[in-house]
Curated annotation (Swiss-Prot):
UniProt record similarity statement: Belongs to the TrpA family.
EC number(s) per entry: 4.2.1.20
Biological function: The alpha subunit is responsible for the aldol cleavage of indoleglycerol phosphate to indole and glyceraldehyde 3-phosphate.
UniProt key word NADP: no
Name of this chain's protein: Tryptophan synthase alpha chain
Amino acid sequence: MAQNRVSRLMQEDRKFLIAYYMPEFPLPGSTLPVLEALQKSGVDIIELGMPYSDPIGDGPVIQDAAHTAIGNGVHIAGILDLVRKARAGEGCEKITVPLLLMGYCSPLIAYGGDCFLSDASEAGVDGLLIPDLPPEEAEDFLFRARGFGLSVIFFISPETPPERIGMIDGLSTDFSYCFAVNATTGTAKLAGADSERDIESYLRRVREHTKKKFVVGFGIKDRARVEKMWNLADGAVVGTALLQAIRNASTPEEVALMTAEFWKTLKS
C-alpha cells in the first residue's frame, strides 16, 4: 500500500511521543482546539478514541471520558467529520500529524466494515487500533484496511508468549502497541523495584522478538515515565493523564490551553 503519514514517520530514527484523546471531552467543541494545541506542542501522533458504552480494557478515567463524549453527541460519523475538518484546517490550523482511531469492534461492525474503512481513509485517518480484534482472526480485515491505505496496529501484553510477539510484530503495519502492565488503562501502579524489573524484562523480551518499532502505553503520566519508556521502547503514549489534566476546563479555549500546558511538561 502507499505510505501514509504514520508509515513515513516510523522510518525516522528517533523516539516518539503519542497522545490519546477522547473527542469532545470534556466539552462539545473541544476536539479541534485540542488537536491544534497538541500539534503546536510537538506531538508526534494523535490517537482519537471512539467511545463505546461497554469498553473492556479501559480504566475509569477513559471510561468516564467515553461516557461524557457519548453524552456530548459523539459517534463514529461525527469523529470522521472532525478529522475531515482538521485535515482541511476548518476551525483550526491544518492538522498534518498522523491521526489514528482507537476503538472496539462492535461499533465498527454496526457502521459497516468496508464503509467505515473507506470513510476513515477519505477523512484523513492514517491507522486503526482495535483492542478486541484478535490478530489470528484479522487477516481479511488487514487486507481490506491496507487496501484503503490504513495502518493496523496490534497489541502486546506482558503475558504474550515470545512466538506470539513475533506474529503480532509481523502483522502490525508499522509498529506494535505494548500494554505497560497487566491492568486497565491508566490504573497501573508503576512504583516499586519489582514492578520496574518486571516492566524492563517484559520490554526487553518484546525487543528481542520484534523487528518493527513498538510503543508503550498505560500509566505514563510525566516526563520521567516518558524517558523511562523511551529507554526501553520506541515511543510513549500518554492518554489518561492528558484527560485528567483537562477534565475541569470550562470552555473549549481553556481545554486547549490546559492541553498545551500539560504537553509542555512532557517535553521538558
